[in-house]
Design a protein with these regions (language model features):
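Flexible, glycine/small-residue-enriched loop-and-beta-strand segment within the central core
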Residues: 20-30, 35-102, 128-130, 134-144
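Conserved G/P- and acidic residue-centered "switch" motifs that form tight phosphate/ATP-binding loops
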Residues: 109, 127
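Active-site/ligand-binding-proximal alpha/beta "capping" segment
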Residues: 102, 116-117
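An accessory alpha-helical subdomain
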Residues: 1-2
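N-terminal helix-cap/turn-to-beta initiation motif at the start of protein domains
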Residues: 6-7
Length: 144
């Protein structure tokens, strides 16, 4: 009940392990079967669009907020850029998703990665900054 009030734009099977921190909640749009593990942070100053069947590991941080590099502008301005995570993704623990990033469908982001640029569908991306190291086979493992 409280979760639905905090994040009203989430589909069935949306679950968060506490503690969880967000700026607003109403800017988080999630499909069905989305799972946030413990200690996640979502700075949702702009929309955060999460597809269905997405697993987000412990300590993941999703940022839409940014600040100008210029010190004078930084005193008064904050920018926000939307983040999108496609269907069937797994975001590894301690990863950071930066403002304006789109992670395509079927992606795995390795633990501890810092995603600064878009990641294409069906990719395994790891590192700081995250780089695609290979495409993922989308055939279910049970059929191999």
């Amino acid at each position: 009940e409280i979760l639905k009030e905090l994040i009203p734009n989430a589909g069935a099977g949306f679950y968060i392990e506490p503690p969880f921190h967000c700026d607003y909640g109403y800017n988080i749009f999630a499909g069905e079967n989305v799972y946030f593990n413990v200690n996640c942070v979502v700075l949702d100053c702009a929309p955060v669009n999460i597809g269905s069947n997405v697993f987000i590991a412990p300590n993941v941080q999703i940022y839409t907020a940014s600040h100008p590099l210029d010190a004078e502008l930084r005193k008064t301005l904050e920018n926000a850029y939307p983040v999108t995570i496609g269907d069937d993704c797994w975001i590894g623990g301690n990863s950071v998703i930066c403002p304006g990033v789109t992670i395509g469908k079927g992606c795995v982001i390795g633990a501890g990665s810092v995603v600064t640029k878009d990641i294409p569908d069906n990719s395994l991306a790891v590192g700081n900054p995250a780089k695609v190291i290979r495409k993922l086979n989308q055939e279910p493992e049970s059929k191999k």
